[in-house]
Design a protein with these regions (language model features):
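Kelch-like beta-propeller repeat domains
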Residues: 19-380
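Sec-dependent N-terminal signal peptides
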Residues: 3-12
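Sec/Tat signal peptide C-region and signal peptidase I cleavage site
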Residues: 14-18
Length: 380
Protein backbone atom coordinates (compact mmCIF):
# COMPACT_ATOMS: atom_id res chain seq x y z
CA UNK A 1 0.00 0.00 0.00
CA UNK A 2 1.50 3.32 -1.01
CA UNK A 3 1.13 5.43 2.11
CA UNK A 4 3.57 8.26 2.63
CA UNK A 5 3.23 8.92 6.40
CA UNK A 6 4.75 11.01 9.19
CA UNK A 7 7.28 13.77 8.09
CA UNK A 8 10.42 13.94 10.10
CA UNK A 9 10.68 16.73 12.61
CA UNK A 10 14.09 18.41 12.69
CA UNK A 11 14.57 17.76 16.38
CA UNK A 12 15.09 14.23 17.70
CA UNK A 13 15.11 12.37 21.00
CA UNK A 14 18.65 11.49 22.00
CA UNK A 15 19.46 7.91 23.10
CA UNK A 16 19.23 7.43 26.86
CA UNK A 17 17.22 10.56 27.66
CA UNK A 18 13.98 9.14 29.05
CA UNK A 19 12.85 12.56 30.30
CA UNK A 20 12.38 13.70 26.70
CA UNK A 21 9.25 11.59 26.32
CA UNK A 22 7.55 13.31 29.25
CA UNK A 23 8.30 16.77 27.88
CA UNK A 24 7.39 16.52 24.20
CA UNK A 25 5.98 19.52 22.34
CA UNK A 26 2.25 19.12 21.74
CA UNK A 27 1.05 17.23 18.67
CA UNK A 28 4.54 17.07 17.17
CA UNK A 29 6.12 13.89 15.82
CA UNK A 30 9.69 13.60 17.09
CA UNK A 31 12.10 10.90 15.99
CA UNK A 32 13.55 8.55 18.61
CA UNK A 33 17.21 8.07 17.68
CA UNK A 34 17.72 4.59 19.06
CA UNK A 35 20.78 2.38 19.52
CA UNK A 36 20.61 -1.36 18.76
CA UNK A 37 21.74 -4.00 21.25
CA UNK A 38 23.54 -7.13 20.01
CA UNK A 39 22.80 -10.77 20.93
CA UNK A 40 25.21 -12.63 23.23
CA UNK A 41 25.89 -15.21 20.49
CA UNK A 42 28.78 -13.83 18.37
CA UNK A 43 27.43 -15.61 15.28
CA UNK A 44 24.11 -13.79 15.65
CA UNK A 45 25.50 -10.27 15.74
CA UNK A 46 23.81 -8.23 13.06
CA UNK A 47 21.23 -5.53 12.46
CA UNK A 48 17.51 -4.78 12.33
CA UNK A 49 16.09 -4.61 8.80
CA UNK A 50 12.42 -3.69 8.68
CA UNK A 51 10.24 -5.64 6.26
CA UNK A 52 6.74 -4.54 7.25
CA UNK A 53 3.59 -6.69 7.08
CA UNK A 54 3.48 -6.61 10.87
CA UNK A 55 2.07 -4.88 13.93
CA UNK A 56 3.50 -3.04 16.94
CA UNK A 57 2.05 -3.40 20.45
CA UNK A 58 2.95 -1.88 23.82
CA UNK A 59 4.10 -4.10 26.69
CA UNK A 60 3.24 -2.18 29.90
CA UNK A 61 5.11 -4.71 32.04
CA UNK A 62 8.40 -4.26 30.20
CA UNK A 63 7.67 -0.61 29.29
CA UNK A 64 8.56 -1.36 25.68
CA UNK A 65 7.16 -1.68 22.18
CA UNK A 66 7.08 -5.25 20.81
CA UNK A 67 7.05 -6.29 17.16
CA UNK A 68 8.14 -9.16 14.91
CA UNK A 69 10.46 -8.31 12.01
CA UNK A 70 13.79 -9.17 10.34
CA UNK A 71 17.15 -9.58 12.08
CA UNK A 72 20.00 -9.85 9.57
CA UNK A 73 23.10 -11.85 10.48
CA UNK A 74 25.25 -14.55 8.90
CA UNK A 75 23.93 -17.40 11.08
CA UNK A 76 20.29 -16.82 10.13
CA UNK A 77 20.93 -16.31 6.42
CA UNK A 78 21.12 -12.56 6.08
CA UNK A 79 18.40 -10.74 4.18
CA UNK A 80 14.95 -12.09 3.32
CA UNK A 81 11.59 -10.32 3.21
CA UNK A 82 10.29 -12.34 6.18
CA UNK A 83 10.37 -11.52 9.88
CA UNK A 84 12.41 -13.89 12.06
CA UNK A 85 12.78 -12.09 15.38
CA UNK A 86 10.79 -10.59 18.24
CA UNK A 87 12.09 -7.09 18.95
CA UNK A 88 11.62 -4.78 21.90
CA UNK A 89 12.05 -1.00 21.74
CA UNK A 90 12.53 0.83 25.04
CA UNK A 91 11.28 4.30 24.02
CA UNK A 92 12.61 6.06 27.12
CA UNK A 93 16.11 4.60 26.91
CA UNK A 94 15.98 4.72 23.08
CA UNK A 95 17.31 1.17 22.75
CA UNK A 96 16.20 -1.58 20.37
CA UNK A 97 16.82 -5.21 21.40
CA UNK A 98 16.46 -8.47 19.46
CA UNK A 99 14.62 -10.50 22.12
CA UNK A 100 14.26 -13.85 20.34
CA UNK A 101 15.63 -14.89 16.94
CA UNK A 102 14.03 -17.94 15.30
CA UNK A 103 16.15 -21.05 14.64
CA UNK A 104 15.83 -20.83 10.86
CA UNK A 105 18.17 -19.74 8.08
CA UNK A 106 18.23 -19.07 4.33
CA UNK A 107 19.63 -21.02 1.38
CA UNK A 108 20.25 -19.51 -2.06
CA UNK A 109 18.98 -21.58 -5.01
CA UNK A 110 20.73 -22.27 -8.32
CA UNK A 111 17.73 -20.87 -10.16
CA UNK A 112 17.85 -17.61 -8.21
CA UNK A 113 15.92 -16.61 -5.15
CA UNK A 114 16.14 -18.41 -1.81
CA UNK A 115 14.55 -20.94 0.50
CA UNK A 116 13.85 -20.82 4.25
CA UNK A 117 14.98 -23.90 6.21
CA UNK A 118 15.55 -24.94 9.80
CA UNK A 119 18.83 -24.78 11.69
CA UNK A 120 19.91 -27.81 13.78
CA UNK A 121 19.02 -25.82 16.92
CA UNK A 122 15.35 -26.03 15.95
CA UNK A 123 15.32 -29.75 16.79
CA UNK A 124 16.27 -28.97 20.39
CA UNK A 125 14.24 -25.79 20.67
CA UNK A 126 11.37 -25.42 18.18
CA UNK A 127 10.63 -21.92 16.92
CA UNK A 128 8.10 -20.66 14.36
CA UNK A 129 8.99 -20.47 10.68
CA UNK A 130 9.96 -16.89 9.70
CA UNK A 131 6.99 -15.06 8.22
CA UNK A 132 4.91 -12.00 7.63
CA UNK A 133 2.84 -12.05 10.83
CA UNK A 134 0.53 -9.32 9.51
CA UNK A 135 -1.69 -8.19 12.43
CA UNK A 136 -2.10 -11.69 13.93
CA UNK A 137 0.26 -10.76 16.77
CA UNK A 138 -0.36 -9.55 20.32
CA UNK A 139 0.99 -9.40 23.85
CA UNK A 140 -1.01 -11.01 26.68
CA UNK A 141 -0.13 -9.35 30.03
CA UNK A 142 -1.82 -12.08 32.10
CA UNK A 143 0.61 -14.66 30.69
CA UNK A 144 3.61 -12.38 30.03
CA UNK A 145 3.60 -13.89 26.56
CA UNK A 146 3.49 -12.96 22.89
CA UNK A 147 1.19 -14.86 20.52
CA UNK A 148 1.27 -15.18 16.74
CA UNK A 149 -1.03 -17.12 14.41
CA UNK A 150 -0.71 -18.02 10.73
CA UNK A 151 1.19 -15.83 8.26
CA UNK A 152 3.10 -15.95 4.99
CA UNK A 153 6.39 -17.41 3.77
CA UNK A 154 6.29 -18.79 0.23
CA UNK A 155 9.96 -19.92 0.46
CA UNK A 156 9.61 -22.33 3.41
CA UNK A 157 11.02 -25.87 3.15
CA UNK A 158 9.97 -29.00 5.07
CA UNK A 159 12.38 -31.95 4.72
CA UNK A 160 13.74 -30.42 1.53
CA UNK A 161 10.30 -29.93 -0.07
CA UNK A 162 8.87 -26.47 -0.78
CA UNK A 163 5.64 -26.15 1.20
CA UNK A 164 5.49 -22.37 1.55
CA UNK A 165 2.79 -20.80 3.69
CA UNK A 166 1.71 -24.18 5.10
CA UNK A 167 4.68 -24.03 7.49
CA UNK A 168 3.17 -20.87 8.97
CA UNK A 169 -0.17 -22.48 9.87
CA UNK A 170 -1.31 -22.37 13.48
CA UNK A 171 -0.60 -20.44 16.66
CA UNK A 172 2.57 -20.06 18.74
CA UNK A 173 3.22 -18.65 22.22
CA UNK A 174 6.48 -17.05 23.32
CA UNK A 175 6.85 -17.05 27.12
CA UNK A 176 8.92 -13.94 27.77
CA UNK A 177 10.15 -15.25 31.13
CA UNK A 178 11.73 -18.39 29.65
CA UNK A 179 12.16 -16.87 26.17
CA UNK A 180 10.89 -20.15 24.68
CA UNK A 181 8.35 -20.68 21.90
CA UNK A 182 5.58 -23.30 22.14
CA UNK A 183 3.42 -24.49 19.24
CA UNK A 184 -0.25 -24.46 20.26
CA UNK A 185 -1.50 -27.53 18.43
CA UNK A 186 -5.28 -27.09 18.46
CA UNK A 187 -7.82 -28.12 15.83
CA UNK A 188 -10.63 -25.97 14.48
CA UNK A 189 -8.63 -22.77 14.09
CA UNK A 190 -8.86 -20.15 11.36
CA UNK A 191 -7.57 -21.05 7.89
CA UNK A 192 -4.31 -19.40 6.86
CA UNK A 193 -5.49 -17.15 4.01
CA UNK A 194 -3.02 -14.32 4.79
CA UNK A 195 -3.35 -10.67 5.86
CA UNK A 196 -5.45 -11.45 8.94
CA UNK A 197 -5.54 -9.90 12.42
CA UNK A 198 -5.73 -10.99 16.06
CA UNK A 199 -5.98 -9.28 19.44
CA UNK A 200 -6.20 -10.26 23.10
CA UNK A 201 -9.52 -9.93 24.92
CA UNK A 202 -8.90 -9.87 28.70
CA UNK A 203 -12.57 -10.00 29.69
CA UNK A 204 -12.84 -13.54 28.26
CA UNK A 205 -9.10 -14.36 28.47
CA UNK A 206 -9.10 -15.26 24.81
CA UNK A 207 -7.57 -14.30 21.49
CA UNK A 208 -10.05 -13.00 18.92
CA UNK A 209 -8.93 -13.72 15.35
CA UNK A 210 -10.39 -11.71 12.46
CA UNK A 211 -9.74 -13.82 9.40
CA UNK A 212 -10.85 -15.01 5.99
CA UNK A 213 -13.99 -13.25 4.70
CA UNK A 214 -14.26 -11.28 7.97
CA UNK A 215 -15.12 -14.36 9.99
CA UNK A 216 -14.16 -14.39 13.68
CA UNK A 217 -12.57 -17.20 15.69
CA UNK A 218 -12.02 -17.40 19.45
CA UNK A 219 -9.01 -19.08 21.07
CA UNK A 220 -9.66 -19.91 24.74
CA UNK A 221 -6.27 -19.41 26.41
CA UNK A 222 -7.19 -21.50 29.46
CA UNK A 223 -8.49 -24.49 27.49
CA UNK A 224 -6.13 -23.99 24.51
CA UNK A 225 -9.10 -24.50 22.17
CA UNK A 226 -10.32 -22.77 19.00
CA UNK A 227 -13.94 -22.28 18.02
CA UNK A 228 -15.86 -20.15 15.55
CA UNK A 229 -17.56 -17.08 17.04
CA UNK A 230 -21.36 -17.11 17.13
CA UNK A 231 -21.54 -13.99 14.98
CA UNK A 232 -19.12 -12.17 12.67
CA UNK A 233 -19.36 -9.01 10.55
CA UNK A 234 -21.16 -9.50 7.20
CA UNK A 235 -19.14 -11.91 5.10
CA UNK A 236 -16.90 -10.42 2.41
CA UNK A 237 -13.26 -10.24 1.35
CA UNK A 238 -11.32 -8.28 3.96
CA UNK A 239 -7.57 -8.31 3.36
CA UNK A 240 -5.92 -5.88 5.77
CA UNK A 241 -8.71 -5.71 8.34
CA UNK A 242 -7.46 -5.07 11.87
CA UNK A 243 -8.80 -5.72 15.37
CA UNK A 244 -8.14 -4.01 18.71
CA UNK A 245 -9.53 -4.18 22.25
CA UNK A 246 -11.66 -1.36 23.69
CA UNK A 247 -11.12 -1.72 27.49
CA UNK A 248 -13.86 0.49 29.05
CA UNK A 249 -16.56 -1.02 26.85
CA UNK A 250 -15.07 -4.54 26.96
CA UNK A 251 -15.43 -5.09 23.23
CA UNK A 252 -13.32 -5.57 20.12
CA UNK A 253 -13.16 -3.00 17.32
CA UNK A 254 -12.75 -4.36 13.77
CA UNK A 255 -11.57 -1.81 11.21
CA UNK A 256 -11.29 -1.60 7.43
CA UNK A 257 -9.97 -4.18 5.02
CA UNK A 258 -11.32 -5.24 1.65
CA UNK A 259 -10.45 -6.74 -1.71
CA UNK A 260 -6.72 -6.83 -2.38
CA UNK A 261 -5.55 -3.42 -3.64
CA UNK A 262 -9.17 -2.26 -4.11
CA UNK A 263 -8.44 0.80 -1.94
CA UNK A 264 -6.66 2.24 -4.99
CA UNK A 265 -10.02 2.83 -6.70
CA UNK A 266 -12.28 5.22 -4.74
CA UNK A 267 -14.68 5.23 -3.08
CA UNK A 268 -13.66 1.78 -1.71
CA UNK A 269 -16.26 2.22 1.03
CA UNK A 270 -15.58 -1.19 2.58
CA UNK A 271 -12.19 0.06 3.82
CA UNK A 272 -13.96 2.60 6.05
CA UNK A 273 -16.21 0.18 7.91
CA UNK A 274 -15.93 -0.14 11.69
CA UNK A 275 -17.65 -2.87 13.69
CA UNK A 276 -17.80 -3.73 17.38
CA UNK A 277 -17.73 -7.34 18.58
CA UNK A 278 -19.06 -8.08 22.07
CA UNK A 279 -16.95 -11.03 23.31
CA UNK A 280 -19.46 -11.98 26.01
CA UNK A 281 -22.56 -12.23 23.80
CA UNK A 282 -20.53 -12.71 20.59
CA UNK A 283 -22.72 -10.21 18.77
CA UNK A 284 -21.64 -7.62 16.19
CA UNK A 285 -22.66 -3.97 15.84
CA UNK A 286 -21.93 -1.58 12.95
CA UNK A 287 -20.34 1.66 14.17
CA UNK A 288 -19.56 4.99 12.48
CA UNK A 289 -17.62 4.75 9.24
CA UNK A 290 -14.04 6.04 9.31
CA UNK A 291 -13.18 9.29 7.48
CA UNK A 292 -10.76 7.54 5.11
CA UNK A 293 -9.81 4.12 3.79
CA UNK A 294 -7.90 1.93 6.25
CA UNK A 295 -5.77 -1.06 5.28
CA UNK A 296 -3.59 -2.85 7.88
CA UNK A 297 -4.18 0.19 10.07
CA UNK A 298 -3.28 0.46 13.75
CA UNK A 299 -5.90 1.80 16.15
CA UNK A 300 -3.79 3.01 19.07
CA UNK A 301 -5.84 3.19 22.28
CA UNK A 302 -4.95 6.10 24.58
CA UNK A 303 -6.17 4.89 27.99
CA UNK A 304 -5.70 8.29 29.67
CA UNK A 305 -8.01 10.10 27.24
CA UNK A 306 -10.20 7.16 26.20
CA UNK A 307 -9.52 7.78 22.51
CA UNK A 308 -8.28 5.72 19.58
CA UNK A 309 -5.81 7.13 17.04
CA UNK A 310 -5.04 6.10 13.46
CA UNK A 311 -3.15 7.64 10.55
CA UNK A 312 -2.81 7.25 6.80
CA UNK A 313 -1.33 9.30 3.98
CA UNK A 314 -2.18 8.56 0.34
CA UNK A 315 0.40 9.87 -2.10
CA UNK A 316 -1.98 9.71 -5.07
CA UNK A 317 -4.77 11.42 -3.10
CA UNK A 318 -7.08 8.43 -3.53
CA UNK A 319 -8.56 9.14 -0.09
CA UNK A 320 -8.29 11.79 2.64
CA UNK A 321 -4.90 11.79 4.37
CA UNK A 322 -4.12 12.64 7.97
CA UNK A 323 -4.17 11.55 11.58
CA UNK A 324 -7.60 10.78 12.99
CA UNK A 325 -9.10 10.08 16.40
CA UNK A 326 -12.09 7.90 17.17
CA UNK A 327 -14.14 8.78 20.27
CA UNK A 328 -15.81 5.52 21.36
CA UNK A 329 -18.06 7.34 23.84
CA UNK A 330 -19.73 9.36 21.09
CA UNK A 331 -19.04 6.92 18.25
CA UNK A 332 -17.49 9.76 16.25
CA UNK A 333 -14.37 10.35 14.16
CA UNK A 334 -12.47 13.64 13.79
CA UNK A 335 -9.15 14.79 12.37
CA UNK A 336 -6.19 15.61 14.64
CA UNK A 337 -4.54 18.96 13.88
CA UNK A 338 -0.80 18.33 13.99
CA UNK A 339 1.97 20.86 14.62
CA UNK A 340 4.25 18.89 12.30
CA UNK A 341 3.54 16.85 9.16
CA UNK A 342 3.41 13.07 9.20
CA UNK A 343 6.90 11.52 8.45
CA UNK A 344 7.22 10.13 4.92
CA UNK A 345 7.41 6.59 3.64
CA UNK A 346 9.51 5.63 0.65
CA UNK A 347 8.00 2.29 -0.27
CA UNK A 348 4.65 0.73 -1.07
CA UNK A 349 4.19 -1.08 2.25
CA UNK A 350 4.77 2.02 4.36
CA UNK A 351 1.56 2.09 6.37
CA UNK A 352 1.76 3.93 9.68
CA UNK A 353 2.13 1.79 12.78
CA UNK A 354 1.15 3.19 16.18
CA UNK A 355 0.64 2.17 19.78
CA UNK A 356 0.16 4.07 23.04
CA UNK A 357 2.98 4.16 25.60
CA UNK A 358 1.04 4.31 28.88
CA UNK A 359 4.20 4.77 30.95
CA UNK A 360 5.30 7.92 29.13
CA UNK A 361 1.78 9.03 28.06
CA UNK A 362 2.61 9.38 24.38
CA UNK A 363 1.94 7.71 21.07
CA UNK A 364 4.78 5.71 19.52
CA UNK A 365 4.88 5.61 15.73
CA UNK A 366 6.95 3.31 13.54
CA UNK A 367 7.75 4.27 9.96
CA UNK A 368 10.00 1.75 8.19
CA UNK A 369 13.03 1.44 10.52
CA UNK A 370 12.40 4.77 12.30
CA UNK A 371 10.46 5.37 15.50
CA UNK A 372 8.68 8.55 16.59
CA UNK A 373 6.90 9.85 19.67
CA UNK A 374 3.94 12.24 19.88
CA UNK A 375 2.22 13.82 22.89
CA UNK A 376 -1.41 14.45 22.03
CA UNK A 377 -3.02 17.62 23.40
CA UNK A 378 -6.64 18.36 22.52
CA UNK A 379 -7.46 21.73 21.01
CA UNK A 380 -3.92 22.76 20.07
Amino acid sequence: MRFLSFILVLVAITPGRAADLKDLPANTWMEIKYATDQPADPEAKGEFARQGWNKIVYDPDGKRVLFYDRWIDKKHGGYTIYGNCLFGLDPGAARLSPIKIDNWTKMETKQGGYRTLVLPENEREPTPCPRHVYHAFDYVPALKSVFICNGANQTALRDGKLVGHDLCDGAWQLDLASNKWTLLAAAGGPPNRLDDAMAYCPVTHSLIYAGFERQLWVFDLAKKEWRKAKQSPPQRTAFGETIFYDPPRQRMLILGGGRLDAWKTPPAAEFRELHAFDPKTESVERLADAPTAFYATHLAYDSKRDLFFAAAVFDQKEHPSGMFRYDPKGNAWSEVKLASPIPPHKNWFGWTQMCYDSHDDCLIGKVNDKFFALRYVAGE
